[in-house]
A protein has these predicted regions:
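Sequence/fold signature of self-assembling virion shell proteins
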Residues: 18-58, 68-73, 79-168
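Conserved helix-loop functional segments at active or binding sites
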Residues: 6, 58, 62
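Long, contiguous amphipathic alpha-helices that act as assembly "spine/axial" helices in icosahedral shell
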Residues: 1-12, 74, 161-163
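Arginine/glycine-rich "motif VI" loop of SF2 helicases in the C-terminal RecA-like domain
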Residues: 65
Length: 168
């Protein structure tokens, strides 16, 4: 969870372009800089999630052509899990007396729903992220696959287990 816990600073972690993971000025090859954060920082609510979906639809490739990015899943800290349920799972608009439909749910905007990340640090408890269907996004490599071993002691019947794996 290191990349997400440090997404807004590149003090400890920066992406391949030298910027923080969530930055307003990711350089592209031929087009203008790309922002993957809301113009105005906002807590998770219906309006901010709708704006994130709209912003995603404006993503362009290095030639300036729209790439039709779509959201797949909302990732939230435990602090926001009930807010996410209200936004994504209710039939009517959350938090209003209006009888409007919940457009996010009705349109199937976030098809995989939300998942709770229990490893966000205290300072990131209100953060939320939208996973997209954009290919070649954030990469995960298993540097050393899971290796397990065990050692048994015949005299005592004790058994020791170990496991090791590495990621990047």
């Amino acid at each position: 969870m290191f990349p997400l816990n440090n997404a807004f600073t590149n003090t400890n972690f920066s992406a391949g372009d030298g910027k923080a993971l969530c930055a307003t000025d990711h350089p592209t090859v031929g087009a203008s800089d790309l922002s993957n954060v809301l113009a105005t920082a906002s807590d998770l609510n219906e309006t901010s999630l709708e704006q994130a979906v709209i912003d995603l639809s404006d993503f362009t490739d290095s030639r300036g052509l729209q790439i039709a990015a779509r959201p797949r899943r909302l990732i939230v800290a435990p602090y926001n899990q009930f807010v996410a349920t209200r936004i994504l799972d209710t039939e009517l608009r959350p938090g209003t007396a209006d009888n409007d439909i919940n457009a996010l749910r009705s349109n199937g905007t976030i098809p995989e729903g939300y998942s709770v990340n229990h490893f966000f640090t205290t300072s990131t408890k209100k953060w939320w992220f939208v996973m997209t269907d954009v290919p070649n996004g954030m990469k995960h490599f298993t540097r050393t696959p899971m290796q397990t071993g065990m050692d048994g002691d015949f005299d005592t019947g004790n058994v020791r287990y170990k496991a090791r794996e590495r990621y990047s």
